[in-house]
Amino acid sequence: MFYFHCPPQLEGTAPFGNHSTGDFDDGFLRRKQRRNRTTFALQQLEALEAVFAQTHYPDVFTREELAMKINLTEARVQVWFQNRRAKWRKTERGASDQEPGAKEPMAEVTPPPVRNINSPPPGDQARGKKEALEAQQSLGRTVGPAGPFFPSCLPGTLLNTATYAQALSHVASLKGGPLCSCCVPDPMGLSFLPTYGCQSNRTASVAALRMKAREHSEAVLQSANLLPSTSSSPGPASKQVPPEGSQDKPSPTKEQSEGEKSV
């Protein structure tokens, strides 16, 4: 079994090659060197800004001349111009993003309308408008040469009050004259349709019929009371009716009556 071991170092020789420890220390310090933030004076900033206003990318000769003038190194001046260009690009980008919003006028914010407590909700209003529009369209389709057709007294389940009133006003405008709120002439003669409403007209007709019946009954009673008085008054002589037995026997002739006398 073999063992490998390092031979003893000779005195006066450098370990691990010909490099000295001083070389490693200088390289380590060079890598670990930290940058210090430069604090510019007011006069230095004014001179740098004046050159930046003329050109954003000064050449090396301009940077060296400026560095000698403000007592800085050319490297510091170059770094300042790099940072200043980055700041300028950021400012321009932010200004371009805000330009569309600045050009467009802000829309006026209008408060929502105050809804009355007793008014129907918006959903019911929209539904009522839709039903009114459908009713008007159906009425427009049923208009013929004889005039607008509208079923007499539509049931209340089909249209609500607002829709029914709008439909009636539309029919009145098409006809060109006033129209009853519940009874519309039916030119198609659809009398078999069930009638709804018209309570006032129906009540009036029933009352008129009852009054006519009462007048007729009174006239009949008056005529019945007048019959006995008219029968007692003198009149033409009534014709005598022969008895029942004489109707079967023929009347005797003249010769037969003379023969009976001679006998």
Curated annotation (Swiss-Prot):
Q: Where in the cell is it found?
A: Nucleus
Residue ranges annotated as compositionally biased, kind Polar residues, are 220-235
Q: Do the record's keywords include Transport? A: no
Q: List GO terms (cellular component aspect).
A: nucleus
Q: Which GO terms describe its molecular function?
A: DNA binding; DNA-binding transcription factor activity, RNA polymerase II-specific; RNA polymerase II transcription regulatory region sequence-specific DNA binding; sequence-specific double-stranded DNA binding
Where does this protein have compositionally biased stretches of type Pro residues?
110-123
Keyword check for Transcription, yes or no: yes
Q: Where is the composition biased (Basic and acidic residues)?
A: 89-106, 251-263
InterPro entries reported for this sequence: HD, Homeobox_CS, Homeodomain-like_sf, OAR_dom, Paired_Homeobox_TFs
Q: Where mainly located?
A: nucleus
Q: Which UniProt keywords apply?
A: Developmental protein, DNA-binding, Homeobox, Nucleus, Transcription, Transcription regulation
Tell me where the sequence motif OAR sits in this chain: 204-217
* Tissue specificity comment: Expressed in most sensory neurons but not in autonomic neurons. Also expressed in the dorsal horn of the spinal cord.
Q: Which GO terms describe its biological process?
A: axon guidance; axonogenesis; detection of chemical stimulus; detection of temperature stimulus; dorsal spinal cord development; nervous system development; neuron differentiation; neuron migration
* Chain segments carrying region Disordered: 88-135, 219-263
Binding region for DNA: 33-92
Family the UniProt entry places it in:
Belongs to the paired homeobox family.
The record's section on PANTHER family has: DORSAL ROOT GANGLIA HOMEOBOX PROTEIN, HOMEOBOX PROTEIN ARISTALESS
What does the record note on quaternary structure?
A: Interacts with RGMB.
Role, per record: Transcription factor required for the formation of correct projections from nociceptive sensory neurons to the dorsal horn of the spinal cord and normal perception of pain.
Name of the protein described by the UniProt record: Dorsal root ganglia homeobox protein
From which source organism is this entry?
Rattus norvegicus (Rat)
Q: What is the lineage of its organism?
A: Eukaryota, Metazoa, Chordata, Craniata, Vertebrata
